[in-house]
Amino acid sequence: MEESKVKDLTAYKNRFEEDASSFSEFQARDFVKELKNQGKTDEAIEVGRTFLEMAPELKGYINYFGYALYNKYINIDDEEISKNESLFYGILEEIAKYCKQERYSPLEAAVNKAIKHVLKADPVDYKKLSELLDYLDAPTLEDKPFVNKDGKEFESKKEKWYRMKVRALYELESYRTCVETANIAFTYNLKWHYNNLNWVKYYRASSLVELGRYEEAENEFIALQGHFNAVDAFEILYKLYMNTNREDDAYTLLIDKFFKGGFDYKNIEDYKKISAMAKAKGQDKAHVLAECLIKKLEEENGKTYEADVDLADYADLTASDAFDRVYSEVVYHLENYITRHEGKVVFYNHDKNFGSIFQDGEENLFFRQADFLDDEEVEKYDVVEYSVIKTYDRKRQQMSSKAVLLKVLYEEINY
């Protein structure tokens, strides 16, 4: 097969030298296009910049000029970018100034290259990332997922933009704009990938906390709890409750986690919270035992811990023994720490091990057998003691509540 003939550009070059403003739309486009395609990048850039000055009415060559800039200054190794970042970002700004966000434009490719460079830094410059994203018009970005040659599906350009923009705004402490941007993202019928949607919800909820919109934030974090393991929703909710004078909610959440978590070094921070709770509630024995548990467990794992009380009376206890003592002091004396309620079981499914408790004037309260403090036989009409935590009903897509830390008090005979 014969090689394609390289176009002779002598006539264009002579005309350019004589009068650059005399080019027609087609001639200017063809000249810059051929220079770029023939690898004469520097000439394509020089000609393009001259046309911008001498023939501002011409537009057809712009994207070829932009790609010449992209090839020479943008599409290079990160090491080369780092040597002269001011030049790199200056050229990017030039491309953004003249090239529209459209098909055959180098704008998106140039911005994406810059974004990749920024994201490789540690720490990430979120101000620069946000500025780069602003070069693009988010509403007009492609919203169809990208599919590679192997048929694997990835996030769309629009999904990617909102994922990064919401994160950047949060990191920049632009909390109100972060919430507003996330809200806009939710209005689009996007097919979300990976955990992108949950991350957007997380940064939105975290911004709501900073804005003092605590109830909205609480609901969002509760909805994420148990569904998005990349973040510790318990820790966030605990701090939110403690910082908004809702210690009872915080302690209920804490004790429920303590009850279910068992004896494990990975729960050491929970044990420290238990100790602080016991101290705040004036439960001296539980506080001392919790301090003993923490100290012994840290020592067994090669670490040190300075207890805030005298532990001489418990020097012979192992960490496991101390845990059992703390568990008994807390779990079997819940009334010393959190609000307790009484109610009657009005439904129980023995096959699925869940049921509900009657609430006057409200929807019956859901519970699971696994949330009972002891392995008790639960029957309809049993009167139980329990505490309440907020949950998210995924089936009905709404906030709800459930009973936790239950124990059977007695069977109601008069039913």
Regions found by a protein language model. Name each.
Residues 303-344, 407-415:
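Short boundary/loop segments of OB/S1/cold-shock single-stranded nucleic-acid-binding domains
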